[in-house]
A protein has these predicted regions:
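Active-site pocket-lining/capping segments in soluble small-molecule metabolic enzymes
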Residues: 2-167, 174-334
Length: 334
């Protein structure tokens, strides 16, 4: 007979400024082992509403990588990961964020196979596909007409249209859910005019400066890197671009403040995304997730810090396969 004390829900430590938010956390097909441990920890100690969906995609013609090119995953590995998330009753959103896909790649068999298996392993009914290309959305619908499709913000970044409420309404005719352009997420004069705000999603931890002048250039470069991963000059160009513009300057970060989150929520937005695209290590993703979920009230700060530290210690080894500067802060077995 177990003598462990019962686990009590910690509703009072979870931030309550977005009580009905539908959270989506990145890291799928990249940080899966630690992401599943995080989800188990959250389901044990936190209210069920905390996280209902993970996002991500394996490296393929339809996805992008910020730091070099990840090694390809086998079909068997992808199948196993989809099955594991289904077993955990967690929805999966395939994040196909490449906005510049070659016409012949729209029929990529691996990508279409992923979408097919995603729809077949969908016990929660929450599985979706997120694309950054109208052409890719059309290609997917030809094979999977019932697949719910989200419009990725990268489609808006590379688009030439003027982003007005009427433009967003046209996107509503094509997509089930639309990610707001990062600039529009901090422009109340625009998002308060949206007729169906519940059909929009917002990234909370966008790393790029608010007025980043080279967002389009960066996405175009990353798309070229996907097509030619062996071209080292492209990687050098990407490194030069990010260092030149101060992409990671925290004082200019596009992270949404609590007041900005509350304003979007009050307007009717309910879908909030914690992305992993710009993280080299899963530890950073986990820390961001806890920061966004846990209360910042002073009377709970010690409990919140203890829970976050306990979770990171519980997860232990963070296997950052890319240079990150976090080697001194790894959790390992004694």
């Amino acid at each position: 007979m177990s003598t462990r004390p019962p686990v009590l829900p910690l509703d009072h430590i979870v931030r309550d400024h977005l009580p009905q938010a539908q959270w989506m956390v990145g890291g799928a097909f990249r940080f899966d082992r630690h992401l599943m441990l995080l989800l188990n920890f959250l389901s044990t100690y936190f209210p069920p509403r905390a996280v209902g969906c993970v996002t991500g995609a394996p490296p393929c013609a339809w996805s992008l990588d910020m730091f070099g090119q990840r090694a390809a995953l086998t079909m068997a590995r992808c199948e196993a990961l989809l099955a594991a998330y289904a077993q955990h009753q967690i929805g999966v959103t395939l994040m196909f964020d490449n906005p510049s896909i070659a016409p012949d790649a729209l029929q990529d068999e691996f990508g279409h196979w992923l979408v097919q298996r995603l729809m077949e392993q969908n016990p929660t009914g929450r599985n979706k596909v997120c694309v950054a290309s109208d052409e890719l959305a059309a290609a997917i619908r030809q094979r999977q007409p019932n697949a719910p499709i989200i419009c990725h913000a990268n489609r808006l970044v590379l688009g030439s249209e003027k982003r007005t409420p009427s433009f967003y309404e046209k996107l509503e005719e094509i997509y089930q859910l639309i990610m707001l352009h990062p600039r529009d997420a901090v422009t109340p004069s625009l998002y308060t005019q949206l007729r169906h705000p519940e059909r929009y999603a917002v990234v909370l931890n966008d790393p790029t400066p608010r007025n980043y002048p080279s967002r389009r250039e960066l996405l175009t470069l990353l798309s070229r890197m996907r097509r030619a991963p062996w071209d080292y000059t492209l990687r050098q160009a990407r490194e030069g671009m990010t260092s030149r513009t101060g992409l990671y300057a925290m004082e200019n970060s596009g992270n949404l403040t609590m007041q900005e989150q509350q304003a979007l929520y009050a307007c009717g937005v309910r879908h909030f995304i914690v992305q992993d695209f710009h993280f080299r290590s899963e530890i950073t993703l986990l820390w961001d997730t806890f920061y966004l979920l846990l209360s910042t009230q002073p009377e709970y700060s010690n409990k919140a810090a203890l829970l976050a530290s306990a979770a990171l210690a519980h997860i232990r080894e963070a296997q950052d396969r890319l240079p990150s500067g976090l080697n001194l802060f790894q959790f390992t077995e004694d």
